[in-house]
UniProtKB/Swiss-Prot annotation:
GO terms for biological process: protein secretion. The keyword Protein transport applies. A lipid is attached at C18 (S-diacylglycerol cysteine). It comes from Shigella sonnei. This is Lipoprotein MxiJ. Its main location: membrane. Belongs to the YscJ lipoprotein family. Gene3D superfamilies: 3.30.300.30, Hypothetical protein rpa1041 (3.30.70.1530). It is found in: Cell outer membrane. It comes from the Bacteria. InterPro entries: AMP-bd_C_sf, FliF_N_dom, T3SS_SctJ, YscJ/FliF. A lipid is attached at C18 (N-palmitoyl cysteine). Residues 1-17 form the signal peptide. Involved in the secretion of the Ipa antigens.
Amino acid sequence: MIRYKGFILFLLLMLIGCEQREELISNLSQRQANEIISVLERHNITARKVDGGKQGISVQVEKGTFASAVDLMRMYDLPNPERVDISQMFPTDSLVSSPRAEKARLYSAIEQRLEQSLVSIGGVISAKIHVSYDLEEKNISSKPMHISVIAIYDSPKESELLVSNIKRFLKNTFSDVKYENISVILTPKEEYVYTNVQPVKEIKSEFLTNEVIYLFLGMAVLVVILLVWAFKTGWFKRNKI
């Protein structure tokens, strides 16, 4: 009997010592999950991917670092949206819409593509672009185009150079926009303070995945059922255990 009690105690200790993880975000693509994990690990937060099949990929972190992980995702504006494909914006089998609607969709796609391109500039963490354009089908008196940019950056020493690079990039993108009609607002990245909240003092086992945990739980339930059956049938008395 002592052996069975010891085995059950061992299983309980293993379950208590399992590393507690919490789902940070789900329904991600492989690229989005990799970007999130890269940012988290650069700030000493351990994260892992879990493939959910058709539901996409989820990212899990330890419960003690969940709050810090959420703050980092907000600071870096993660997850980044999927790359915009013009062919997806205008599929060949879609109904023909008005020229006004087609123009609005086109400029919306252009704005998203430009936002993705600006992140490639060194120092830019995330960017939002708004392009003013005339939706009228007959541009008899077309208004001059204006472009506004809000960018979050992490290199304050090169802020002036960053503004110049962004303006030059947008000026070369649109041939009919004037340099003075491009406005750029830079916002410095928030200071990050790492917080690691440990709810309980626990023994961590990196090799214990969810599948292993479920296996141990199943084994524990099976042992309990066998013990109950043995007591009811008098098996221990017959075998003098």
